[in-house]
Amino acid sequence: ALAVDHAGENIRANTLSLGPTADDRFFSQWSSEEEAHQNSSTLFNRLGMPEEMASGAVFLASDDSSFVTGTDLLIDGGYTAK
């Protein structure tokens, strides 16, 4: 694993798994029924915003995650728990 192979070099290796994300391109093509179905796919009954997804990447790239490696950060609004 990348995290194991490079830990001695103080290199962190993590991944992001993103859930359903709001995007104007999709909203413009969805009927109100499709939009309601997509929104209901998460525990918060809405899609994630792009900035919410980006915050995970910012966290992993920051010093705040200096002791985080070998993990997958799941940002999906509870989609996988549902």
Residue ranges and their predicted role:
Residues 1:
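Active-site helix adjacent to the Tyr-X3-Lys
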Residues 4, 11, 54-55:
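Conserved active-site helix of classical SDR/Rossmann-fold NAD(P)-dependent CH-OH oxidoreductases
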Residues 4-8, 21, 48, 61:
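A short hydrophobic alpha-helix cap/turn motif
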Residues 5, 24, 80:
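Active-site beta-alpha loop architecture of Rossmann-like, nucleotide-cofactor-dependent enzymes
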Residues 7-12, 68-70:
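Short, small/polar-rich loop/turn modules that mediate ligand/substrate recognition or access, typified
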Residues 8, 15-42:
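A glycine/serine/threonine-rich, flexible loop-to-helix segment
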Residues 46-75, 80-81:
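C-terminal substrate-recognition "lid" of short-chain dehydrogenase/reductases
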